[in-house]
Design a protein with these regions (language model features):
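Low-acidity, Ser/Thr- and Arg-rich intrinsically disordered low-complexity segments
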Residues: 1-6, 10, 15-20
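Conserved N-terminal entry element of GNAT/NAT acetyltransferase domains
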Residues: 18-46, 177
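Acetyl-CoA-dependent GNAT
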Residues: 36-106, 111, 116, 129-131, ...
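Active-site acidic-Proline motif in GNAT/NAT acetyltransferases
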Residues: 116-118, 122, 150-151
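Glycine-rich acyl-CoA binding loop
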Residues: 121-126, 136
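Conserved active-site alpha-helix within GNAT-family acetyltransferase domains
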Residues: 126, 150-168, 174
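Conserved GNAT acetyl-CoA-binding A-motif
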Residues: 136-148
Length: 177
């Protein structure tokens, strides 16, 4: 039987309405006791495309829906590593680790971390961050950076608990679209 993806935390169900999985996560106690598994994804599967359709809007309302081709571009380059986190086989979080070989050394950057709203606070984000830190260290990266809006208070606390420190730096951006 195919169940809609549904996570229930503190009695508050969050449903995406999709029929993308045959597993249903329910109950804050069950979620807390489940193990989080992380893995690097190297190809654009239906499951990953569907996970982005569900998760990416929770990160950015302006992000465009990713199709197989777009996910393939993300996973098809040696500088990118797409990490996913699963609970009971269901993808509940993603993180993009970008490695940049520079004249000053290999640098790593974490981008687009998103954990399903109902799975937040249960170790999913930390599992993704820890996996990314390990991969970057194993690759010989000198540093690993990420940016996060100040309004994402819980995420910022997570990053600080994981060892990230705020830098005295200014981020500049030019909109190209």
């Amino acid at each position: 039987m195919i169940w809609p993806t549904s996570l229930v935390v503190s009695g508050d169900p969050i449903r995406d309405g999709s029929q993308s999985t045959d597993r249903q996560l329910a109950g804050a106690d069950r979620l807390r006791s489940m193990s989080v598994e992380t893995e690097a994804v190297r190809e654009a599967t239906d499951e990953v495309v569907e996970a982005f359709a569900r998760l990416l809007p929770q990160l950015s309302t302006k992000a465009k829906r990713l199709d197989h081709e777009a996910v393939g571009r993300l996973t098809g380059t040696s500088t990118n590593t797409l990490l996913v986190a699963r609970v009971e086989g269901v993808i509940v979080g993603t993180l993009m680790l970008v490695m940049s070989p520079l004249p000053s050394g290999l640098r790593a950057h974490i981008e687009d971390v998103v954990v399903d709203a109902a799975a937040r606070g249960h170790g999913v984000g930390r599992a993704l961050i820890d996996k990314a830190l390990g991969l970057a260290a194993d690759a010989g990266a000198r540093t690993i950076d990420l940016t996060s809006r100040p309004s994402r208070e819980a995420a910022n606390r997570l990053y600080e608990r994981a060892g990230f420190r705020r830098r005295e730096s200014t981020v500049y951006r030019v909109a190209l679209d």
